[in-house]
Each structure stands twice: as C-alpha cells, then as structure tokens.
Amino acid sequence: MADSENQGPAEPSQAAAAAEAAAEEVMAEGGAQGGDCDSAAGDPDSAAGQMAEEPQTPAENAPKPKNDFIESLPNSVKCRVLALKKLQKRCDKIEAKFDKEFQALEKKYNDIYKPLLAKIQELTGEMEGCAWTLEGEEEEEEEYEDDEEEGEDEEEEEAAAEAAAGAKHDDAHAEMPDDAKK
C-alpha cells in the first residue's frame, strides 16, 4: 500500500480502488473505536461516545442542522462521506502541527537575525546631507516660491469678494419678515 501512495494511480480504476482502500482503512479504524459507519450514522449514542474522546472546537460543539440531502444518500456514499470527513480531520491536525512548527522556526530565526539587523541599522543610520545640489533643483525651488506668492494674493482677493457677496445676501434676507420667507 505504501508504494501505491507514493505513486499516482495510472488508471481511473486504480484511483477508485485506492479511494476504496482508504475508505476501508478509515472505516476499519472507526470499527475499532466503536462501530462501523452504518451503526455510527444510525446510533447517536455511539457517535456521542466518540465525540467525548476527542477535544472539539466550539464550532464542532454547536448543533448542526439536519441535511436531508446527506440522509437521502445510499449507505455506501454516507460511509465514503464519513471517511472523507475523518481524513480531512487528520489533514487539519497535521496542518495545525505544521503551522505551530513553522511559527517556532520563524521565531528562532528572527532571534538569530536581531543582532545582524541591529548592525545594519547602525551602519546605515540616518541619511547624510550633501554639500552640493543639482542646478535644476535650484530653478524649480525659485519657480515654486513665485507661484506660492501669486496664489496667496489671488486667495486673499477671492475671500474678500466672497465676504462682500455674503454680506449683500444676508442684508436681503434681513429685510423680509420670517412669514414672507416661507
């Protein structure tokens, strides 16, 4: 069986046989733990006994809605679904273990990198100033300063014009009584 796991199935019939063998293996483990898939699917007490053995997340403890579709499937398909769920749980456990080990490895190497990063920071430090500037930069700075002065004059004129227009508008409304405005 180890050879067939390492090599991909060459034909669809081999793939079906491999899937069936995996399902039988999972079902055999389920049978050793308290019954086969038919009794586990039909007997809620044996399923509860299996659940009590394994710690579960809050999402798994939540009541699950009945799925009429799965209940309408033949027993052989239900067994395959159950086998796939068990295999997925195994994969999830392996993935969780991988994530924990990966985080530990990252932390280990971050600790190793800290002195090197500190030396890099010490060597690079702040940017050093230059004694020379480009000719194009001086011209751009002068143009920018001229534009700023012109913009400020225009803004002051616009603000004065708006204030005068606002005062005229307020005076027109002040002469009318409140009843006439409606």
Curated annotation (Swiss-Prot):
Basic and acidic residues composition bias: residue spans: 167-182
Q: Name one GO biological process term.
A: nucleosome assembly
Q: Does the keyword Nucleus apply?
A: yes
- Tissues in which the UniProt entry reports expression: Predominantly expressed in brain.
> Which keywords belong to this entry?
Coiled coil, Nucleus
Q: Where is the composition biased (Acidic residues)?
A: 135-160
The record's InterPro entries line, in alphabetical order, gives: NAP-like_sf (IPR037231), NAP_family (IPR002164)
Its family remark reads: Belongs to the nucleosome assembly protein (NAP) family.
Q: What protein name is recorded for this chain? A: Nucleosome assembly protein 1-like 5
Species whose genome carries this gene: Homo sapiens
